[in-house]
Amino acid sequence: MKRKKLWMLAAILTCGLELTACSISDNATKADTEAGTKADLTVLTEWQAGKTVSDKIVAAYGGLDKCFAAEPIPDGVWARMQGKTYKENPYIGRDDLRHIRALHWDYDNQIHVGEMICNKQIADRVVRILRQLFDAKYPIQRMLLPDVYGADDETQMRDNNSSCFCFRAIAGSTKLSKHARGLAVDINTLYNPYYKDRADGTRFIQPATAAEYCDRTKSFPYKIDHDDLCLKLFTEAGFEWGGDWKSCKDFQHFELIGE
């Protein structure tokens, strides 16, 4: 009888130790998960454009509605723009512009954090369009401020970056671009290039690496054409598409009509 009692006591103690170990392990796993979630959340709380996030992190942040907004330009972003996309000028200032936060999908079905600077006149429209594109899982490869590329348009286009504001002239001209006022948006720029056929038979292309994408009869990722959702949404919102221009073609480009 004593042996039986001792055996039962040993079994109870062993079970208790195992339960305690399981509890400690579960608590450690929970702590690790919470720490990981907190670390991942900083991608959104600090709005780290270019980083990827999961549906779970978006939900923990507060949901999709919180991830699409147009706000006054934060001090840190404004500092990054100085001497790059923004130069002192008499035409447009900080109060005329807005910082857009948005999420976007890529072709690999990953969610990316994006940002864009645009004129306050079109900010709400652009946010609405970007949300509709996200809801439709429309692929946009990158949405970074051109300042990341030193405000060099050729460089950012080669990287297929999508953007809006940059205080600069039209290529090959001294006339200010609609981008200089934040009234034009370029989407998936490598695959939707600008080109102009010259009188001498040569063709000027931007980005220079996009010659193969000037042939719009071909099928390739990120292509904008007349059946494209991005084109539909921008034109419905009062923008014109550079792909319809006669003297040149700018397939990436949407600018506000009449401004």
Predicted regions and their residues:
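Bacterial N-terminal signal peptides that target proteins for export
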Residues: 1-9
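Gram-negative bacterial Sec-dependent N-terminal signal peptides
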Residues: 9-17
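C-terminal motif of bacterial Sec signal peptides marking the signal peptidase cleavage site
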Residues: 19-21
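Bacterial signal peptide processing site
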Residues: 23-25
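N-terminal module-boundary/linker segments of secreted carbohydrate-active enzymes
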Residues: 32, 36-110
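Catalytic cores and adjacent binding grooves of peptidoglycan-active enzymes
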Residues: 42-47, 170-176, 182-259
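Active-site acidic/histidine clusters and adjacent loop/turn architecture
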Residues: 92-157
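Active-site-adjacent loop/helix surface patches within enzyme catalytic domains
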Residues: 139-183, 189-194
